Amino acid sequence: MKRIFQTIALIGKPRNPDALQTHKTLFDWLTGKGYDVLVDHRLANDLDVPQDCLCDLLTIGDKANLAIVVGGDGNMLGAARVLSRFDIAVIGVNRGNLGFLTDLDPESFKEELTRVLEGEFVTERRFLLEAEVHRHGQIKSRNAALNEAVLHPDKIAHMIEFEVYIDDNFAFSQRSDGLIIATPTGSTAYSLSGGGPILSPSLNAITLVPMFPHTLSSRPLVVDGDRCIKLLVSPNNGSTLEVSCDGQVSLPVSPGDEVHIYQSPEQLQLIHPKNYNYYGVLRAKLGWSSKLF
């Protein structure tokens, strides 16, 4: 019987011995079952595995059928921006804090992962955002974000000025500390802490969440996911700004630049155990009340 996943990759730079032990346990367990296992090359100095198993994320995306990300959501975000370019399924073992994107319990993952490897899983496709900085009509820099792209001051927090256009239609101008533009996946992250709404992952929508706006009438806005958001940065801003992608990659923005943010054509193929329930995850992670009866 042909396996659904024959080549499996282990991803995630561990920050603690427990995460490293999970990598080692996974490697030994999967190779013992006859799977071909690739390992994130960033683990080379921490994990005792054959050198020919080590490779970068681009090679993993090209060769593997399944990627197992060990760590927290930050590890998943970093992997997602690369692996979304490839036809590869991704699942996570939670060794972080909240773990909205990493389903498997590190202490008991073997049972659930066995069922996943046998084909008992559900698939979600999560879209990413593309963020571009335009200067004098040319793209100066760009990157992708699974959670959010955030326009904010560079080093010192202060008020900035910009205009917001949706598909070339002027929406509003704003004086604030910045603007969070989030996917449904990112609606439970930075956007949520800024007062934004929680969006079901299947929604084709983008949220715009002002950061400490100067007017009380500024409120979060949800727009169709196929819209292009354009931010025109005022030339009067006295210093350089940034667009931060998932809090991991920063794009410098100068006064007078334009920032274009739109849905990427690439999607992350995220898989979950068969019993996955998004609202159950929200209830557990956010401390919602349990059933009354």
From Swiss-Prot:
The lineage of its organism: Bacteria, Pseudomonadati, Pseudomonadota, Gammaproteobacteria, Vibrionales. This is NAD kinase. The keyword Protease does not apply. Involved in the regulation of the intracellular balance of NAD and NADP, and is a key enzyme in the biosynthesis of NADP. Catalyzes specifically the phosphorylation on 2'-hydroxyl of the adenosine moiety of NAD to yield NADP. Belongs to the NAD kinase family. Its EC number is 2.7.1.23. It is found in: Cytoplasm. Its cofactor is a divalent metal cation. GO terms for cellular component: cytoplasm. Its main location: cytoplasm. SUPFAM superfamilies: NAD kinase/diacylglycerol kinase-like. It comes from the Bacteria. The active site is at residue 73.
